[in-house]
Every structure is written in C-alpha cells, then in structure tokens.
Amino acid sequence: MSETSPKLRAELDGVPAYVPGKPAAAGGPVAYKLSSNENPYPPLPGVLESALAAAGSFNRYPDMACTGLMNELADRFGVPLGHLATGTGSVGVAQQLLQATSGPGDEVIYAWRSFEAYPIITQVSGATSVKVPLTDGEVHDLDAMAEAITDRTRLIFVCNPNNPTGTVVRRAELERFLDRVPSDVLVVLDEAYKEFIRDAEVPDGIEIYRDRPNVAVLRTFSKAYGLAGLRVGFAVAHEPVAAALRKTAVPFGVSQLAQDAAVASLRAEDELLGRVGSLVAERTRVSAELTRQGWTVPESHANFVWLRLGERTLDFAGACERAGVVVRPFQGEGVRVSIGEGEGNDLFLKAAEAFRAEL
C-alpha cells in the first residue's frame, strides 16, 4: 500500500478550528449555558406544530427553492424575490458569499476581534484575511478598514452588532465608510443580532442595501427566533450577488422542517417582540450590575455582554463554571456572556462579583 495520502488544498493548512460554546455538563453542577448566544425560550407558537407536520415527509427532499420562506421574507421586508437567498444559518450564507467573490490572491477585510467564523471561511476560500483591530472602545475602526482596502480587496464584513463585543456602527459613520468603498467591493452587513438593537441611530441594513448595489445583508433565525438547531438564515442583496449565492448554495441544504419553522416564527411576531424585550431588559440589568461591581462593560446591543479580561480570561471562565454557569472565553482577550434565564444571569453576576473581590 502506498504511504502517500490524497493531495489536499494547501489553503487548508493551519485553518483555525471553530470553537463552539461549551455545553453545560450533563448531570454535573453546571446548570446554565451562557456560552453560545442561544435564545433561552422554547420555540415560538406554531413552530412545533409546523415541525411535526414536516416530520411526516422526511423521506422526501425539501423544497430546494425555499419557496414558502422566500415569499414570506419578500413580503416582510419589501424586497424582490430575486434579491433573496437562503442558507444554513447566516454563517452558511457568508461562506457562499466568499465562494462567489473571493479566492487565492484576493483579500477579505473584517474587524478583529469579530465573529470567529470569518477567518475560517476566508482561509477555506483561499483568500487572505486582513484583520483590522477594534478601537479602544471595542468598536469597528471604519477609517482604518477603509484605508486597508487595496485593489485585491473583494469583500468586507461589518458585523453589526459585533460578536463578541456587542458594539455597533451607527448610520452616519457607516454611510461615510460605504462612500469610501469601491463599487466593485462587496460590503456584507452581518446582522445576526439585529432584533436586539434599541438605538435608533443604528441603521437597518436592508434600508442601506436598497440604494447600494455593493451591499449585502445577512440575517439568521438562530438568535432572536430561537431556531439555532435548525440552521436557517438568509441574505438580501441585489440580483447579481443574490443569483451567485443561489448558485453556490448546497442543493437541498435547508431542510423542510427548518423552512416551515422559519415561516411559523415570522408569523409569531407579537410573541417574538415580547421575548426579545424581556432579553433586552435582562441585558440592561446585567450590564448595570456589572458596572456597579466595577467592571468595564461596552454598551451591548445584542443578547450578550463582553468583558475584556486579558490574562485573567480563563481563570474567570473557570470561576463561573464552578459557580454553575458556562461562559465563552477567548483566551488572552476576554469572555462573552450570553443573556439567558434570570436565574442563570444571577448566578453569573454572583460569580463575577466574587471574582472581582479577589483581584
């Protein structure tokens, strides 16, 4: 037998592994998982019923065109059907965008730290990441990002709100930035946490896209809508980009169960708003208490908060786990803490206060 192995793409060498939020230990002392920005509420009304109905046809392929969901989204956001594309969560659509735009020799710009998947999917595409550090206030440095554009730049991610810091880019600064971006460079507004924003100065990306052919918007059903386990997201973009997304989509990638659940979730708007409102109130409470304890907490516009801890990051995460909550550490940088059930949030706050008392 030959000792050589199949030849693989060199671009995959050194691709960083995506690190998911650590789960709560089964049967152990840890009771609350605040590590993955999941919605703590059960599925919205009508979702389980739609899922059960879809379960009866698991022997059939799903609607590859996602017709029902696409029509619902077109009506909801007032966009043409040809400007929509679906995928396996917003990260799946982001990967499709890179497949459509970027390859070896191309550059992809994004802030750092930002969404952990960006460097992974960029390297898999063969393109080169250009990471632009956040400002001291943990927000996108849009001036520096604009200055980083070269003739090799093909795509720019703007995560708004930013994961994991929760900070936002407001309308005036975003418009100034977009005016500096060449028309042949695609700007992707990643709005996975859009529903949690309460600042009127933070623009709706779909309104921005309407007049800018080089802007695409990503949304997901994983966060506010509570469908993280079903993997369904979508993009809104002008026809050439949306058409390319449909070409790069995995055939039958979005299950029928996910499609039907997403439609049912869209139709449960009142309940959704109530749940999101409760999570925003908890976010405000948690942020205020952390500030009272003496922590520096960037203003969050998502369903999580960020603490920059540097070398103390893993110690803090360990203290939280011993107290009964799992948070998401980014070694040497800080921790992201999802807003969950009130009891879990209280346990986290107690752990944070105890840790600070020992500093």
Curated annotation (Swiss-Prot):
Coiled-coil ranges from the UniProt annotation: none
Source organism, top-level taxon: Bacteria
Enzyme class label: transferase
GO terms under biological process: L-histidine biosynthetic process
Cofactor: pyridoxal 5'-phosphate
Reactions this protein catalyses: an aromatic L-alpha-amino acid + 2-oxoglutarate = an aromatic oxo-acid + L-glutamate
Positions carrying N6-(pyridoxal phosphate)lysine: K223
Entry keyword set: Aminotransferase, Pyridoxal phosphate, Transferase
Family annotation (CDD domains): AAT_like
EC numbers, comma separated: 2.6.1.57
Annotated GO MF terms: aromatic-amino-acid transaminase activity; histidinol-phosphate transaminase activity; pyridoxal phosphate binding
Gene3D superfamilies referenced in this protein's UniProt entry, alphabetically: Aspartate Aminotransferase, domain 1, Type I PLP-dependent aspartate aminotransferase-like (Major domain)
Similarity comment text for this entry: Belongs to the class-II pyridoxal-phosphate-dependent aminotransferase family.
NCBIfam families, sorted: hisC (TIGR01141), PRK03321.1 (NF002878)
Described purpose of this protein according to its UniProt entry: Aminotransferase that catalyzes the conversion of aromatic amino acids and 2-oxoglutarate into corresponding aromatic oxo acids and L-glutamate.
Self-association and partners: Homodimer.
Protein name as catalogued: Aromatic amino acid aminotransferase
Name of the gene encoding the protein in the UniProt record: pat
